[in-house]
């Protein structure tokens, strides 16, 4: 759907009118925003990160990973959309969930990531591993809000699992944060 989704087309029209722009200018901005948000999922990137994490992180940090309840999730995923809402105490949170799912033959989720993580090299790798980026604030930009909403709606409609962190950001102390 992208910029052709009804909600986005309406927001483009509103943007063009409110900012005295042509439809072409507003549509161009909508495409830039869609590119800013969207993941660019790549099996090769997932395989690369899996090998890297196995060799240099998981086998050195953990003695093992105790996974419980995955069969129930696998069963639910056959007929329901899955949204994971883990706590976010460290960077390991999103990496570990995707790693476990991948190793158990399930597709890792698309992960909502703060726009601050969209930096050179790291941002591209995260995007290819399923991260989609979101700004901390949506206020004052109806076009961005429409693009983001349309993107998440499309992921859900296509049956992709999504991972959001209710706290909004990673804890700096290791303690759970209040949801935002």
Annotate the PLM regions.
Residues 1-163, 168-180:
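Membrane-interfacial terminal anchoring regions of lipid-handling membrane enzymes
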